[in-house]
Amino acid sequence: MLFRSWVSSEARVIDVIRDSLLLFGEALMATGDRFALCGFSSVKRSNVRFHRLKDFDQRFDDRARGRIMAIKPGYYTRLGAAIRHATTILEKQTAARRILLILSDGKPNDLDLYDGRYGIEDTRVAIVEARSHGIVPFCVTIDREGASYLPHLFGPAGFAVIRQPDELPARLPMFYAQLTR
């Protein structure tokens, strides 16, 4: 799973993200499915931060939980770069179904030219590239305007808009169950 560190004036949103990742990690561990948890944020092209909170070969233990608890709101959303990095990681997995579940708070953007159409198109190309490698990208967003641009990026069935961040902990396992059927 790839999540974008939310930038929000409400500290509560990041708390919901932490809780969601902790509960989702516990649920995935109970299924026996192999999974990784990663995060990202960016400040221009030269500074994309990709954080590996739990790798596929690591246990979901107190160290992984501690890394999740240490998550802080980040900067910008250079989503195409993060998807490409996650694709490289997922390509090495031999699972029958490789799912890239993305949590985001809004449109791809950054301080440079990545804002606007360029960021949208770069992200769309990264999604097409991921699919060409047999990866199934799915985006969950709390951006209420997500329905206006996410179909272009992920297709009509490749995303979900969550209007209330509090719904995230309960809905993540449902999305995962749908994606793994």
Question: Model features per residue range: what roles?
Answer:
Residues 3-181:
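Acidic, glycine-rich A-domain
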